[in-house]
Each structure stands twice: as C-alpha cells, then as structure tokens.
C-alpha cells in the first residue's frame, strides 16, 4: 500500500458485496445493456455485488448531509434549504466512468422513490475546437487548460443553489461542441457530474470543484488495461463511422488498419497517458470511494476513505 492510500480502507469484492442484503437488481439485462459504454463490460451480478452496496452507502451519506443541514439550521435559527446531492465521478478516458454514472442514475432514481436524478458530463465544458485552435492548444484537448473551468464552477454553484441551468453539449462523433444545442439541467434531488477533470482545481484556486460534491467516486484500473480498452474503443468507433462522413472518425476508415492502430497508440501515449499520469490520477485520493477494475473490467477492489 502506498502513502496515497493510507487514509483509505481497502475492501475486497467478496467483503463489499456482503455489506448489503441480497436483493434483485432494479433493472433488466436489456436496460443494463442499453446504458453501458460499447467497449465496457458489466453484468447484473456486478450490479448486485458492487453497485447496490454503493447506492446504499450514498443513501447513508445523503441522510448524514440532511441531518447536518437540519442541525445547522437549528444553530443558525433559520430553516435549512433543501439542496441537491451532487456526486462526482472521475477516472481515465475509456475506464468506464459513463457506464458507472448512467447505472447510478438508474439505481438512485429507483432506490429513492420519486427522486429526480440528473446526469451531466464535463465534456460540455470543453472549449469549442475553433477556440482551441485560436489559442494554439488543439493538441492539448482534454488537458486542464482546454476546459472552461470558470463556467463549470458557475454551473455547480447554480445547481447547488437549486437553479435550472442550460449547458453546452459535446459530441464525440463530431469531436466538438454542438453549436446552438443545450442540455437543460433541472434542479434535481441528485446531480451526477462525470468527467476526467471533476476533481481538478481551476488555475485561480479560489474555489475547489470538490467542495461542491457530497460524494465522489474514482474509477481506477491498471494503465496497460486502460490503454487496451482505449485502443479497442477507438477501433470500434471506426466501425460505427464507416458510413457517416460527418463523423470525426470517418477519415480513419479510409486508412490502412496498421496506420490507424499506430495513430491511436500515439494519441494514447502523447495525450491520454500523459493526461492520466500528470493530471487525472493525482486527484484519485480526493474521492470518497475508488472502484478498481481488473483486466476483464470486473471491479475487484474497493477503497473507502476512512
């Protein structure tokens, strides 16, 4: 165990699954298939063993937050205002953050009857490609400077205060922000914020993004495994783009497969791996829970902050 994990409790999958009574997963195999990322692997057994105990833990944190807010209201002699419970989900590109986030959205909406659950990805806070080109940092897309962190902080502040917010929409198919398109995020009981940068700090350091989170999750895996999943995802994106000239990946379908694999590997080394090692992984210990995946995508270890 490294110093990074000294303030975490390491829990095996077997022990973790015993922390919650066995119940039938509140979703079908078809629903699970529809929400998983197309290069990810997850089963109903994973839902039972990992995610139902996780949802129960979130329930504990939510109850604790509400009790504290009530007690503070008594101390301040004023009525406490209801706020959304905000969950941050971080991790590398291609590690399975989106699957985890979408699954949590379903589980929370069905665990808490009548609860509303919004899901937001920080991809929408990337600067448009044209802006990145003008700033000379298109090749740094995904790195901290390519995000409008002030806009992200403003969004979190407004959501925390119960306001509805419209935010930009990013398309992986066109590899850019979609002009004129917005996602309307309503003031909800739960808001899940997913992205590689959700534990990072803006350069001015006046506010910490993690200050807005009531619970936080980091999806982790070995670097070699993540690289394999990234390359697999890249090639699968090509298969989807074969008949779509508007797709960012279409141009790669016209290239020899060897050149494509070489290009994808270079992107991994120069961008995604560098970003992971320098900016994403160093924020891992800011999470309340770390879900570690093995080579076959199965979560084998859980780290819970003490």
UniProtKB/Swiss-Prot annotation:
ATP binds at residues 91-98. It comes from Streptococcus pneumoniae (strain ATCC 700669 / Spain 23F-1). It is an enzyme of class 2 (transferase). Its EC number is 2.7.1.33. It catalyses: (R)-pantothenate + ATP = (R)-4'-phosphopantothenate + ADP + H(+). GO terms for molecular function: ATP binding; pantothenate kinase activity. This is Pantothenate kinase. Keywords: ATP-binding, Coenzyme A biosynthesis, Cytoplasm, Kinase, Nucleotide-binding, Transferase. One of its GO terms (biological process) is coenzyme A biosynthetic process. It comes from the Bacteria. Pathway: Cofactor biosynthesis; coenzyme A biosynthesis; CoA from (R)-pantothenate: step 1/5. One of its GO terms (cellular component) is cytoplasm. Belongs to the prokaryotic pantothenate kinase family. It is found in: Cytoplasm.
């Amino acid at each position: 165990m490294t110093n990074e994990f000294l303030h975490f409790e390491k829990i095996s999958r077997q022990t973790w699954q015993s922390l919650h009574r066995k119940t039938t997963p509140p979703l079908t195999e078809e629903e699970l298939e529809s929400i998983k990322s197309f290069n990810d692997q997850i089963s109903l057994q994973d839902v039972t063993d990992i995610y139902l105990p996780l949802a129960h833990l979130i329930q504990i944190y939510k109850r604790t937050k509400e009790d504290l807010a009530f007690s503070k209201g008594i101390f301040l002699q004023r009525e406490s205002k209801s706020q959304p419970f905000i969950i941050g989900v971080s991790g590398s590109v291609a590690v399975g953050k989106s699957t985890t986030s979408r699954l949590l959205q379903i589980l929370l909406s069905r665990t808490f009857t009548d609860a509303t659950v919004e899901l937001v990805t920080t991809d929408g806070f990337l600067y448009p490609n044209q802006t990145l080109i003008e700033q000379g940092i298109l090749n740094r897309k995904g790195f901290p400077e390519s995000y409008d962190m002030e806009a992200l902080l403003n969004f979190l502040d407004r959501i925390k205060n119960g306001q509805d917010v419209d935010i930009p929409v990013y398309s992986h198919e066109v590899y850019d922000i979609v002009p004129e398109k917005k996602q309307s995020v309503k003031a909800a009981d739960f808001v899940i914020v997913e992205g590689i940068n959700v534990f990072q700090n803006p350069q001015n350091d006046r506010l910490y993004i993690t200050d807005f989170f009531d619970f936080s999750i980091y999806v982790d895996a070995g670097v070699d495994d993540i690289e394999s999943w990234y390359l697999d995802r890249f090639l699968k994106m090509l298969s989807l783009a074969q008949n779509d000239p508007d797709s960012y990946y279409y141009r790669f379908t016209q290239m020899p497969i060897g050149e494509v694999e070489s290009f994808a590997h270079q992107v991994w080394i120069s961008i995604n791996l560098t970003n992971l090692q320098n900016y994403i992984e160093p924020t891992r210990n800011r999470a309340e829970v770390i879900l570690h995946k093995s080579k076959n995508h199965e979560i084998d270890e859980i780290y819970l902050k003490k």
